[in-house]
Amino acid sequence: ERMKTRVKELRTAANMTQQQLAELVHVSSRTIISIEKEQYNPSLLLAYRIAKVFDTSVEELYCLEENLELDEKQYRELQTDVGKGEQ
């Protein structure tokens, strides 16, 4: 399973380079590049370290694609339900 990641989004928002993030979490910049391209799923320890850098949770940083699709479906259903209730 592939995990969707917000690493690049959070890193760029923090004006941080891939090299800077790599140094903070004790990996190579190539590892960060692979994570951002979603070519590599990090270990739980590395995911935790990255989340800690951005003061967020592992759950906020990563989600499985299937969970993302489910969340989007649930969101659309909720919008439909709310729309019906407002009429």
Show where each model-derived region lies:
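Short alpha-helical DNA-recognition segment
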Residues: N15-S34
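DNA major-groove recognition helix of helix-turn-helix
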Residues: E36, Y62
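Residue-level signal for the short linker/turn that defines the boundary of a DNA-recognition helix
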Residues: T5, N15-M16, P42-L45
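Alpha-helical residues within the helix-turn-helix
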Residues: T12, E23, K52
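DNA major-groove recognition helix of helix-turn-helix/homeodomain DNA-binding modules
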Residues: H26, L45-E60
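A short, Lys/Arg-rich alpha-helix, primarily the initiator
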Residues: E1-A13
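Short, charged recognition helix plus adjacent turn
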Residues: C63-Q87
